[in-house]
Every structure is written in C-alpha cells, then in structure tokens.
C-alpha cells in the first residue's frame, strides 16, 4: 500500500495518556508537511502501541493526492471547506469511514480542514 500521509513530529508527547488527560493546543502548533503536496497536518495523538492516530489536517486549495491506501481504518470529519475523493464531494459536518486497504484519492477545490482518526483493524476476538 502507498502510505502518503506521515507524521514527522517527535518533539512532544503524542501518546494516549495512561492517567488523566492530554491537551494539545492546536492554535499553537505548526502545520507540518505530511508527504503529499498541499496537505498539512497537526498530529494530535500517535500511539502505535494502541494502534491509533488522530490528526488535524489542512488541505490547500487545489491540492490532490493520487490513489493510495492506509493500513488502518480511516475516519474523516470535515470541519471547514470542501473535500473530495473518488466517490464524491463532502462539506462541513460530513463523516467518511474507509476500511483498511481501501484505495482512494483525496483533494480539495477550495481548501478544507478535516479531523482524521486512524485505527488498526482487529479481528473479531478483539
């Protein structure tokens, strides 16, 4: 599978808290290039042992990512702007879930901000 969106943030804790809460002040975080032109991320949680990633992603006007897939479930909640893939277009409040390995494109005609959740697939026994 072609994994195009990758975090490079190792400067702060991204692990799920063992106790209490984890606060990420997203307004104070820089946008990071995440491997595809015009796609920028603020990684909020990246915990490989728990099999989860949560990102805030900004998609520039006109940005497009070719067909690719992720090894995890991908859940997308559109916060602002417009976002599209090979199946259609989405706006604020729309929620999309992709299965692991689902080939898809991604892009925006006029810019978008989305919240992304990635989680590993587990078998039915948990």
Q: Residue locations for each model-derived region?
A:
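Short acidic-glycine-tyrosine-enriched beta hairpin
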Residues: 84-105
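Short beta-strand/loop turn elements enriched in aromatics
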Residues: 43, 59-70, 120
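Conserved hydrophobic/aromatic beta-strand scaffold that supports enzyme active sites
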Residues: 41-43, 54-58, 75, 95-97, ...
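Glycine- and acidic-residue-biased ligand/ion/polar-headgroup-sensing regions
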Residues: 60-61, 69-86
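A short, N-terminal "cap"/entry segment at the start of jelly-roll beta-barrel domains
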Residues: 1-50
């Amino acid at each position: 599978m072609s994994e195009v969106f990758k975090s490079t943030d190792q400067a702060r804790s991204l692990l799920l808290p063992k106790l209490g809460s984890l606060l990420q002040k997203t307004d104070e975080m820089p946008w990071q290039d995440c491997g595809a032109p015009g796609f920028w991320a603020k990684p909020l949680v990246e915990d490989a042992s728990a099999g989860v990633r949560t990102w805030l992603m900004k998609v520039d006007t006109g940005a497009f990512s070719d067909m690719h897939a992720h090894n995890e479930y991908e859940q997308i909640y559109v916060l602002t702007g417009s976002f599209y893939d090979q199946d259609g277009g989405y706006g604020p409040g729309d929620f999309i879930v992709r299965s692991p390995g689902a080939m898809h494109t991604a892009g925006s005609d006029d810019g978008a901000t989305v919240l992304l959740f990635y989680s590993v697939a587990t078998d039915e026994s948990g």
